């Protein structure tokens, strides 16, 4: 036998059996089925993305054990056929243009180099774009002008109305009522005790008037009793009907007023004193209010200063406490280092103190 014939037969046996190739096309979107069927006993198979290899599916996307799918690379890859009837066609759902390419259906049979291989070429094209013409209907508006002339006749009856003169009498009653009654109710409460914190010195000029009657009669003088400057009520002089009187009055102060009637009766009025007391009370109230306001402001300022001082003390304490802790930690670490150095020095000194004493009486 020729050697060439032997070599060719060996190559055919080593190569897997190829059933053929199929071409499948479709548009992107719908599902596409790649056909694959085999005969004989139910056996395992695989689908490979790419051309069929020599021994196994190197880029397998679906594997079966003959009756069930054991591996699926993507959920879009499905075997919808009856595996027990040897229908192992591959269905790809939601296809895209990127799915185009070569697929290999490999069915494994018993024995060496007996696998069946089917090569499927898939071509997916983009979906066709359908252009729908748009028809626009424009309604036509027709305008019809109609002119209608209607004769208009208007009859207005003329009626003469007699003139009537109506006498008009206008009477305007005038009533003027003037009420000139004025009632003034004045209630004056003079406090019996008045505390005036300030001392006011008022110069007093004393004028002594003496009336000499034409006839010598016994004369009686009523002089006011001297009072202290703190007394709010001045000394009063009772009215006298005597023909001679000596009166001491302050001429520079408007607090006193005197009236004299025809019978030489002297009457003293205390309105000026009451007005002075009211003015002094108002001044005292104003001073008290101002002092209270100043006290409130001073209290608020003092409170703020106290709070700021407390805050500064707390911050200073925290700062010094941290500083002391750091100093203690540094001193503690330095003490440990010194202790270790002392221990090392003692050990070295102890080793230096060891010496060897040779015996003077050495034996042969």
Curated annotation (Swiss-Prot):
It comes from the Eukaryota. Widely expressed, with highest levels in kidney and testis. Expressed by activated CD4+ T-cells during the development of helper T-cells responses. Changing residue 346 to R: About 50% loss of ubiquitination. Ubiquitinated at two lysine residues Lys-338 and Lys-346 on its cytoplasmic domain. Ubiquitination promotes receptor endocytosis and target receptors for lysosomal degradation and termination of receptor signaling. Residues 317-364 are cytoplasmic. It holds the Pfam family V-set. Sequence repeats lie at residues 138-143, 144-149, 150-155, 156-160, 161-165, 166-171, 172-177, 178-183, 184-189, 190-195, 196-201, 202-207. It is a single-pass type I membrane protein. One of its GO terms (biological process) is phagocytosis, engulfment. Disulfide bonds join 36-105, 46-57, 52-104. Residues 21-121 form the Ig-like V-type domain. The extracellular part of the protein can be cleaved and detected in urine and is in correlation with the expression in the kidney. Phosphatidylserine receptor that plays an important functional role in regulatory B-cells homeostasis including generation, expansion and suppressor functions. As P-selectin/SELPLG ligand, plays a specialized role in activated but not naive T-cell trafficking during inflammatory responses. Controls thereby T-cell accumulation in the inflamed central nervous system (CNS) and the induction of autoimmune disease. Also regulates expression of various anti-inflammatory cytokines and co-inhibitory ligands including IL10. Acts as a regulator of T-cell proliferation. (Microbial infection) Acts as a receptor for Hepatitis A virus. PANTHER family: HEPATITIS A VIRUS CELLULAR RECEPTOR 1, HEPATITIS A VIRUS CELLULAR RECEPTOR 1 HOMOLOG. This is Hepatitis A virus cellular receptor 1. It comes from Homo sapiens (Human). The gene is HAVCR1.
């Amino acid at each position: 036998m020729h050697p060439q014939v032997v070599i060719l037969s060996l190559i055919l046996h080593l190569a897997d059996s190829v059933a053929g190739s199929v071409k499948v096309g479709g548009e992107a979107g719908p599902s596409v089925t790649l056909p694959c069927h085999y005969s004989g006993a139910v056996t395992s198979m695989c689908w490979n993305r790419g051309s069929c290899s020599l021994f196994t599916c190197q880029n397998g996307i679906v594997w079966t054990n003959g009756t069930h799918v054991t591996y699926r690379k993507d959920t879009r890859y499905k075997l919808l056929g009856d595996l027990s009837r040897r229908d192992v066609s591959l269905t790809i759902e939601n296809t895209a243009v990127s799915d185009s390419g070569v697929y290999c259906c490999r069915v494994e049979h018993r024995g060496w180099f007996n696998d069946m291989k089917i090569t499927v070429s898939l071509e997916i094209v983009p979906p066709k774009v359908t252009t729908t013409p748009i028809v626009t209907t424009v309604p036509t508006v027709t305008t019809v002008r109609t002119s209608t002339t209607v004769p208009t006749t208007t009859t207005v009856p003329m009626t003469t109305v007699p003139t009537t003169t109506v006498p008009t009498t206008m009477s305007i009653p005038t009533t003027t009522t003037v009420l000139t009654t004025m009632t003034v109710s004045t209630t004056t409460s003079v406090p019996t005790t008045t505390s005036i914190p300030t001392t006011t010195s008022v110069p007093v000029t004393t004028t002594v008037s003496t009336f000499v009657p034409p006839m010598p009669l016994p004369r009686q003088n009523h002089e006011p009793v001297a009072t202290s400057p703190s007394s709010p009520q001045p000394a009063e002089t009772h009215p006298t009907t005597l023909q001679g009187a000596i009166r001491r009055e302050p001429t520079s102060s408007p607090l006193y007023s005197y009236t004299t009637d025809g019978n030489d009766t002297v009457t003293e009025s205390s309105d000026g004193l009451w007005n002075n007391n009211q003015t002094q009370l108002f001044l005292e109230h104003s001073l008290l209010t101002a002092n209270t306001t100043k006290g409130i402001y001073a209290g608020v300022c003092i409170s703020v200063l106290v709070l700021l001082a407390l805050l500064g003390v707390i911050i200073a304490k925290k700062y010094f406490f941290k500083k002391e802790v750091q100093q203690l930690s540094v001193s503690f670490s330095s003490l440990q280092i010194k202790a270790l150095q002392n221990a090392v020095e003692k050990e070295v000194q102890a080793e230096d103190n060891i010496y060897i004493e040779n015996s003077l009486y050495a034996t042969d």
